Amino acid sequence: MTNWSSKDSLKVYNVPYWGAGFFNINDAGHVTVAPDKSRPDAHIVISDAIEQLRQSGLTTPVLLRFPDILKSRVDALFNAFGQAIEKSGYEGDYLCVYPIKVNQQSRVIETISQSYSDKPRLGLEAGSKPELLAVLSHHHEQGSVIVCNGYKDREYIRHALLGNLMGHKVYIVVEKPSELEMVLDESARLNIKPNIGVRAKLASTGSGMWESSGGSMSKFGLSASQILALVERLRSLDKLDCLQLLHFHLGSQIANIRDIQGGIRECGRFYSELRRLGVPIDVVDVGGGLGVDYEGTRSQSHCSANYSLSEYANNVVWGIGDVCREFDLPYPTIISESGRALTAHHAVLVTNLIGAEGVEMSDISAPDEDAPTLLQNMWQGWLDLRGEDPSLLEIFHDSVADLGDVNTQYTMGLLNLEQRAWAEMLHQNTCLALKEMLNPVNRNHRALADELSEKLADKCFANFSLFQSLPDAWGIGQVFPVMPLTGLDRPLSRRGILMDITCDSDGQVEHYVDGLGVESTLPMPQYEENEVCYVGFFLVGAYQEILGDLHNLFGDTHCAEVCLDEEGKMDIRNVVRGDTVDQLLRYVNIDPSVIRENYQRIVSHPALDDATRKALLDELELGLQGYAYLEDE
C-alpha cells in the first residue's frame, strides 16, 4: 500500500472508461478535467475551481458546467457520422438535433446551438409549447431545423407553422392520428405549407429502463395501418409532398447495439415502403437512444453501453444506406436526437462532506462470571475467532443470532442497557475481525465479504439533496460516477456510503463505480480531521436539473461555468446563485412577508429587550436570504 499512486486510483474509479478522455487524476491526487479535445494539455483542477468560488463567497454544493465539453461532444458526434458517411459512400447528409428536454438551461442550449455554425446542421427539438417557444427564439440562422414532437394542441401547431415564417425549417411530427387534421386545419387557416413528419411505432424495442418507448405498446407513434391511413388522407388532398420526415424512437440509453441494429433495419423497411407508395420522405430521424457509459463497463447494463460513438454512427449510416442501395432509393438526410450523449459529461456536482461515522474496534473485556449465558456464548465465539482455523461463516451466523436474542431479552427486561451495549460492541468487533480474515477469492466467502463491506462502511454525510441533484439515482437506480476530488494519491483504505442532508432514509447513494463493476460502497482515502473532503458526482448534465424536486425545500444549487481562456487557464464565468430560503418558501406559497410579520408580533413580547428583539429579527433576515444548504460560519 505504500507504493500507491494516482494511477491506482484511476483504475479503482474506472475513470478512463467513463470519463471519455475528459477527466483524470494528477500526480498530486487531484481530479482534473481537460474540457477541450483540441487542447488536450490544458487541464483544470476541479478543487481549484471550488476554492476560487469559495473566495468569491459561494459555498458548496455547486454545479460546475464545462461548456468546452459540450462543444467537444458536438464535434465528436459530427466526426463519427462524418467518418461513417465517408467510409460507407452514403450520399446523404447528417443533422444533429438536440432535444432540449434533456437540459433546458439557456446556456446549455446556446452553447450547443453555437458550437457548429459553419452551416445549419445542428437543430433543436421541442416536446411541448414552452419548449417550442424557447427553441424558436434560440435559433438565429436561416434554415435552422426544429423538430416538434410530443402531444400537440392547435396553439402548439400554430407556433410550429409560424416558425416557418421566421425562416426556420420546422417539422411537425404526427404522433397520434388526430394530430394530422389539426395540422391540416391550422396550416390552411394560416396559409402556410406544413412540413409533416410521422413517428412509426416499431415492433423493435430497446432493452433497459426506457424500453416502453418502443414496441407496439409505446405511448407515442402510429401503427402500420395508421400510417397507411395518414398517407391516403394526404394523397386525397394532394398534399402527399408535405410528408417529408420519418421518425422512430426506441427509448433513451440503449445499452445493446443489437437493439439499435434491429430498430434501424425496421425503420429502413418503413422508409422503403413509404417511398414505394410515392411519399417523398427525404429525412429519417432515428431519435435518441445513444447510450452513455456511466459505469465504464462497456456492457449491456442499464447504465452502460456495449458500443462506442463511432460504432453507433456506423450502424445507423450503414443500416439506412443498405436499404437505399438495395431498392435504389435516394439517400435521406439522417437526424439523430442524441441529447444525453451531448450533455451528460459537461456537468459535475461538487459538494463537501460535513461529517462521517466510522466503525472502529471497541476496547471490550470478558463478561463477568455471573453474566447471562447468552453473553458468555458471544464471548466464546470471539475467542474461537482468534483461535486456530476458525469457522468464519459459522462464527458470524452465531454472532448475528446471539445479537438478535440479546435484543429480544433486552426488550423483555431480562438484560440491562449496559449488557445490550456490550453485546453490540462485541458483535461489531467480530464483524471487523471477520472482514479482515475473509478471502473474497474464496467463493464461499464472497457473499459475506460483500455484506460486511457494506455493513461496516463509513456513513459519510454530504451537503446536498439526492432528490434535487441526482433524482435518477433515487428514482430508477441510475449509476453516476462518484469520487473524492483530492487525496487520491493515497491508498483507498476506507469504504463509505454517501448520505444526503434530507430527512429521508432514501437519501443515500446506493451504487458506486468500482473498477470494472458497481459496488454498494465507495472506496475512499483516509482524511485528516481538519482536512476538507470534496466529492464530485460526474456525468450529471442530462435530465438531473429539470427532474430535481424540492424535498425538505432544498432547491437549486449554485452553478458556474468553468472555461479555458486563450492561454489555457481556468476562467470562471456566468455564476448563478442557488435558491435562497426566501425563494423556496415562495415556491410552496409560503409568503416570507407573513413570516416577518409573525416574527415581529411574537418578539414584541415585553419579556424581550430591544437588543434581543433586533438580534432575533436580524437572524430571521439572514436565514431568509441565505442558501438552503449548510453553510460555513
UniProtKB/Swiss-Prot annotation:
Tell me which family the UniProt entry assigns to this protein: Belongs to the Orn/Lys/Arg decarboxylase class-II family. SpeA subfamily.
Question: What residue ranges are annotated as transmembrane?
Answer: none
What is this enzyme's catalytic activity, as reactions?
Answer: L-arginine + H(+) = agmatine + CO2
Q: Which GO terms describe its biological process?
A: arginine catabolic process; putrescine biosynthetic process from arginine; spermidine biosynthetic process
Keyword vocabulary terms for this entry: Decarboxylase, Lyase, Magnesium, Metal-binding, Polyamine biosynthesis, Pyridoxal phosphate, Spermidine biosynthesis
Taxon lineage: Bacteria, Pseudomonadati, Pseudomonadota, Gammaproteobacteria, Aeromonadales
Source organism: Aeromonas salmonicida (strain A449)
Q: Which residues bind substrate?
A: 284-294
Which enzyme type, at the first EC level? lyase
This protein is called what? Biosynthetic arginine decarboxylase
